[in-house]
């Protein structure tokens, strides 16, 4: 079984800035401070680009996790995809879409996450009862941090 969820965030900043900021290793690390997420291999600082890999180490549910992601799709400033190539999930695909807001006053960022938990039938139960909601909350927290930082960067300074 697999699960899919979508998170839509309006950010008052141009798509190019939102796109680039979304690929920042440092911003990702700061947004995931509660789980002590760190880049430990591959690209460990700066902006991720096409074909880049990064291995993240974190703690979720009190358990240490390692996940290596690949930037498998990249079309600046409209889209990128990260996929797990090694880690705790049977499958993890996270599509990031960026479009100019209808009022042209910002960017609509749409995250589409498709994942499958490990552990057979037990994983299916965990996926349905806990994991989907937990992961959506992580994306919401990350996006709130991204929104705050990006809007501060885009705001005119006197």
Protein language model features and the residues they cover:
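Short alpha-helical segments used as structural interaction elements across diverse proteins
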Residues: 25, 54-56, 129, 139
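K/E-rich alpha-helical interaction surfaces of small helical-bundle regulatory domains
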Residues: 27-30, 93, 99, 141, ...
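Beta-strand/loop substructures that line and gate deep hydrophobic ligand-binding cavities in soluble
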Residues: 81-137, 157-158
């Amino acid at each position: 079984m697999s699960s899919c969820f979508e998170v839509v965030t309006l950010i008052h900043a141009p798509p190019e800035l939102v796109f680039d900021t979304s690929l920042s290793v440092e911003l990702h690390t700061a947004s995931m401070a509660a789980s002590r997420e760190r880049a430990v291999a591959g690209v460990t600082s700066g902006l991720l680009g096409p074909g880049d890999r990064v291995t993240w180490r974190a703690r979720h549910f009190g358990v240490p996790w390692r996940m290596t992601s690949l930037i498998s799709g990249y079309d600046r400033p409209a889209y990128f995809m990260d996929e797990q190539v090694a880690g705790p999930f049977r499958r993890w695909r996270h599509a990031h879409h960026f479009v100019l807001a209808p009022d042209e006053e910002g960017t609509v960022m749409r995250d589409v996450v498709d994942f499958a938990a490990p552990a057979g039938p037990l994983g299916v139960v965990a996926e349905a009862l806990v994991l989907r909601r937990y992961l959506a909350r992580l994306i919401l927290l990350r996006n709130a941090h991204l929104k705050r930082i990006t809007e501060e960067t885009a705001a005119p300074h006197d």
